[in-house]
């Protein structure tokens, strides 16, 4: 087997950027930054969302206002006129005729 093909697996300190929550987990993440946590020095990985800040785990639900979204859409596109199809292009387009199938002959 080839040597040094697998990345180094080590304990890494993950820091939630939004809440400041820190936890240690095994990972192959490589970082130049290190931080002391609970008396040991770990490489640091900053994450934007963790179990401390995700709405599913915290129980805080952010409801989407469906009517507000519709109003926002109408406000944005109320001044836009719908595109009219060109009459010449519609009239010149030939109708597609269905092909007739040959009659089926019955065997005697």
From Swiss-Prot:
Keywords: Ribonucleoprotein, Ribosomal protein. GO terms for molecular function: structural constituent of ribosome. One of its GO terms (biological process) is translation. InterPro entries: Ribosomal_bL28/bL31-like_sf, Ribosomal_bL31, Ribosomal_bL31_B, Ribosomal_bL31_sf. Residues 97-108 have a biased composition (Basic residues). GO terms for cellular component: ribonucleoprotein complex; ribosome. It comes from the Bacteria. Residues 88-108 are annotated as: Disordered. NCBIfam families: L31, PRK01678.1. Part of the 50S ribosomal subunit. Belongs to the bacterial ribosomal protein bL31 family. Type B subfamily. This is Large ribosomal subunit protein bL31B. It comes from Chlamydia abortus (strain DSM 27085 / S26/3) (Chlamydophila abortus). The lineage of its organism: Bacteria, Pseudomonadati, Chlamydiota, Chlamydiia, Chlamydiales.
């Amino acid at each position: 087997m080839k040597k040094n093909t697998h990345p180094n697996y080590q304990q890494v300190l993950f820091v939630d950027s939004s809440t400041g929550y820190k936890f240690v987990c095994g990972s192959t993440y490589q970082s130049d930054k290190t931080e002391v946590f609970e008396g040991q020095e770990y490489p640091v990985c900053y994450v934007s969302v963790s179990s401390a800040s995700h709405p599913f785990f915290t129980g805080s639900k952010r409801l989407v206002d469906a009517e507000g979204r519709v109003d926002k859409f109408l406000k944005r596109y109320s001044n836009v006129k719908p595109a009219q199809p060109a009459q010449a292009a519609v009239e010149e387009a030939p109708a597609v005729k269905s092909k007739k199938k040959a009659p089926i002959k019955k065997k005697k």
